[in-house]
Swiss-Prot record:
NCBIfam families: himA, PRK00285.1. The keyword Transcription regulation applies. The gene is ihfA. GO terms for molecular function: DNA binding; structural constituent of chromatin. This is Integration host factor subunit alpha. It holds the Pfam family Bac_DNA_binding. This protein is one of the two subunits of integration host factor, a specific DNA-binding protein that functions in genetic recombination as well as in transcriptional and translational control. Heterodimer of an alpha and a beta chain.
Length: 99
């Protein structure tokens, strides 16, 4: 199961008592701020949670798995996430969930 933006907004509505529209707008604004910072080349640091970083990957050789043909994989910029120590500890110490 995955946590969705709609579920985040519902949790804000339930825990903070703000109306559902404001909760939805707050969640959207939060993610828009992260996207905007990353688009402008900034690192995003969320204390106690982790960091979103940008990495530039060089062009490299690849292979089409269907045909075996060699093809170049273009240089690109990717987003990486590194969890913070607090998040790592909480996840490591949590009980496994059966799927």
């Amino acid at each position: 199961m995955a946590l969705t933006k709609a579920e985040m907004a519902e949790h804000l509505f339930e825990k903070l008592g703000i109306n559902k529209r404001d909760a939805k707008d707050l969640v959207e604004l939060f993610f828009e701020e992260i996207k905007g910072a990353l688009e402008s080349g900034e690192q995003v640091k969320l204390s106690g949670f982790g960091n979103f970083d940008l990495r530039d990957k060089n062009e490299r050789p690849g292979r089409n798995p269907k045909t075996g043909e060699d093809i170049p994989i273009k240089a690109r910029r990717v987003v990486t996430f590194r969890p913070g120590q607090k998040l790592k500890s909480r996840v490591e110490n949590s009980e496994p969930v059966d799927q």
